[in-house]
Amino acid sequence: MSAAQGWDRNRRRGGGAAGGASGVSGAGAAGGGRGTGQLNRFVQLSGRPHLPGHRPPPARSGHRCVADNTNLYVFGGYNPDYDESGGPDNEDYPLFRELWRYHFATGVWHQMGTDGYMPRELASMSLVLHGNNLLVFGGTGIPFGESNGNDVHVCNVKYKRWALLSCRGKRPSRIYGQAMALINGSLYVFGGTTGYIYSTDLHKLDLNTMVWTQLKPNNLSCDLPEERYRHEIAHDGQRIYILGGGTSWTAYSLNKIHAYNLETNAWEEIATKPHEKIGFPAARRCHSCVQIKNDVFICGGYNGEVILGDIWKLNLQTFQWVKLPATMPEPVYFHCAAVTPAGCMYIHGGVVNIHENKRTGSLFKIWLVVPSLLELAWEKLLAAFPNLANLSRTQLLHLGLTQELIERLK
């Protein structure tokens, strides 16, 4: 544990924003391969660090990421190791005030130069992708809990420009470790911590009117979810589901989950169904969560004793838990994960060893659905012709590539 994290733990109730606890962790190696054998199999991506000007991002935790068909976007993060975080070249040490993209087609990392004001709350913020726009809310700087945010920053990844949304209404407190989802044109924000107390507050930002509203559910206080941070949320358009999370001294169970009903404005408690032989997933916080239609996938995290390396699927219609036949090569927490529209999940960074306070910069991918024939053919083509992106648009069209595939090369 770093001195900053120890200070944070001892000084207040609120949790750390990017790692730090006690326990053990495991690590391993990763293999590769293409085709249907990739389903439920982690593949480590080394990138192309030999290309000039294309170093990979340093190891970090507490960052967030999103993905489209073409890129993985990684924002922010924290690493108390002075050398690993860039040494004298990093003016924001131990934070990373930077935006990276990993280009799937070429395997190249690129630190994006942007205009406008990039937020300084760089640990345990919330991040969603809305069209070409990254929407960033909340987060904290250093010391954790002393410089929190409650603004919504927008970065258009096409024009590489940051802007601040001008919002009215009852906005959330300055928090970090909250969870956020984009549902029917509105941002919903639940939970988090100020650094002193944990929250059960639920807020909604209408992106058409730019008005914040604090939602007041029709429940007794005893029926509300427990206060928490570093949880994840999923939704089906009618309900928002709260998955895990905790405080600096506990992690919440996944046997039962709370769901906020958007139609009735009330919290409900839903009993999930265990895996037939294994039971329920372990309680956890600081895990990752991605969603494909009605299937929700949680990965990694910390249960108060060990760093977890498992991956589970929850169906939002049956509430059945299924443990996938895959184990993370590096069990992590305070990592980030995102899924592409095609169903491939990417996992980056996180804390891999608590005692040594060690972070990783590793990037892994895993197909959560059977890849389509188009995706299989695309991966085969990129493997056979790694310099395809260097050809002109005219040459690519002449080779028979569609406009959609050509866009994924740029």
UniProtKB/Swiss-Prot annotation:
Transmembrane segments: none annotated. InterPro entries: Gal_Oxase/kelch_b-propeller (IPR011043), Kelch-typ_b-propeller (IPR015915), Kelch_1 (IPR006652), KLHDC10 (IPR052125). GO terms for cellular component: Cul2-RING ubiquitin ligase complex; cytoplasm; nucleus. Residues 15-36 have a biased composition (Gly residues). Residues 1-40 are annotated as: Disordered. Pfam families: Kelch_4, Kelch_KLHDC2_KLHL20_DRC7. It is found in: Nucleus; Cytoplasm. Its main location: nucleus. Disulfide bonds: none annotated. Keywords: Cytoplasm, Kelch repeat, Methylation, Nucleus, Repeat, Ubl conjugation pathway. GO terms for biological process: positive regulation of stress-activated MAPK cascade; protein ubiquitination; rescue of stalled ribosome; ubiquitin-dependent protein catabolic process via the C-end degron rule pathway. Substrate-recognition component of a Cul2-RING (CRL2) E3 ubiquitin-protein ligase complex of the DesCEND (destruction via C-end degrons) pathway, which recognizes a C-degron located at the extreme C-terminus of target proteins, leading to their ubiquitination and degradation. The C-degron recognized by the DesCEND pathway is usually a motif of less than ten residues and can be present in full-length proteins, truncated proteins or proteolytically cleaved forms. Belongs to the KLHDC10 family. This is Kelch domain-containing protein 10.
